[in-house]
């Protein structure tokens, strides 16, 4: 397999499976379905997560101090929207290649187990303390107002911890315009950051206006690149309907208004991993075909003679169905781009593909941090 964390163009084989026992000639075809069902969606999530990370890299580089961490810009909020726990865990593990934050907490244990990591000593994944609508509604029912619970969160429940607070259970702008200013003393004395969390409405409009209002109430500083940064006691997290397009729109509008990208963090939900909205508004469903994830038989031995196997349907007008034939050599060209040469009659030993599993043994075991650094160019902050 090509080493995990490598960016691979469509059409370049990532995995090559070869049978090593003469009594199990068709084992490669049997295992093909199992491998695809386990791998394609985490691969797609890793790719989509990397797209968000590249976007974060761009806006952090333009508007934020260089020491800030773009891998904290987006969190995985998608667990409850996935088809099952196992899928949520595997896919959030893929997301954590690009970012450090997830609300799918079992993914952290999954990485600990399968990548010999230790979440107690390594920055594998970070969750967050956060309220939910049931918390806000229950306390409102008892107190008769929202301000009492906001103050209790700041002074009694989490006086020394950052937390997010869903803020639109009843009247979001009343929370921003009246309740938070009335709690300014408690917020500024709080040993942590309060992240307000809008959860409905027009994402771009609400996010940008919220940051402007918080700046007017709580102030902040101007960073080394000339962009405004909210006081560290206050911020915003948006986790409703995030897409690549509207996340970019938020950061772009903030940039135009002189605010740094790190004033807001995003919670990316399951919709973003199930469909991608293109700039023209067209929705593309995320399937195996989206990133060309498929496995095909390319080589066999019949009566001791090697044969090349391939498919090339005449009705395939998109030219995406034609497969490689024979054993493949994956290599880097002079520009460092991955290329494929096929037609070999034996497993190629000197290319990018390397043995990962053979005859019951694992080879080339790597840490999760090794894979992260490979994906992010060896420097997670650029």
Q: What residue spans do the PLM features occupy?
A:
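Buried, small/hydrophobic-residue-enriched core segments of structured protein domains
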Residues: 4-224, 243-246
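Gly/Ser/Thr/Ala-enriched C-terminal appendages of enzymes
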Residues: 100-118, 139-148, 172-173, 180-186, ...
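Structural preference for beta-strand elements that scaffold enzyme active sites
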Residues: 162-164, 193-197, 233-237, 263-267
